């Protein structure tokens, strides 16, 4: 199976969302050694935590070309790239999916960790809350499956 991931957090976040991404991928690699894992990310921070995924045999890091800025690529370019890479499944590891997976008939999973921008709106700028909300709503509407990491998140979503 060819599984694609929005791996931005895996390579650039070294707390909750990044740890979740790396732990999930470790489990996939251990339990399904025949699968190929395509790690889509706009940039890679090469650290002790990320080096294993850069060099691992069944992982391939995929970055945008020069024409696509990172955020634009993650939202509007990944579905096309996933189709080109003939992926069997796309996993949005943190609240969002690229636009166009459904049109390309690529099944998807999105992991929802929380909806903190709703729970604690005072901690977020209005524009950020709007963007997070739009991305999360889109992902939950179009995902083949939604993973909520807790019962509380399940209720909130």
Label every model-predicted segment.
Residues 1-157:
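Carbohydrate transferase catalytic cores enriched for Leloir-type hexosyltransferases
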């Amino acid at each position: 199976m060819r599984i694609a991931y929005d791996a931005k957090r895996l390579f650039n976040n070294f707390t909750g969302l990044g740890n979740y991404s790396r732990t999930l991928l470790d489990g996939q690699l251990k339990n399904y050694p025949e699968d190929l894992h395509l790690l889509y990310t706009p940039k890679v921070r090469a650290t002790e935590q990320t080096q294993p995924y850069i060099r691992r045999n069944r992982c391939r890091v995929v970055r945008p070309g020069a024409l696509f800025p990172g955020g634009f690529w993650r939202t509007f370019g990944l579905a096309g790239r996933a189709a080109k890479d003939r992926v069997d499944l796309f996993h949005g590891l943190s609240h969002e999916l690229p636009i166009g997976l459904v049109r390309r008939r690529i099944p998807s999973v999105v992991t929802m960790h929380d909806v903190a921008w709703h729970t604690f709106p005072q901690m977020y700028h209005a524009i950020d809350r709007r963007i997070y909300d739009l991305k999360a709503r889109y992902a939950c509407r179009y995902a083949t499956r939604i993973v909520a990491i807790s019962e509380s998140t399940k209720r909130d979503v």
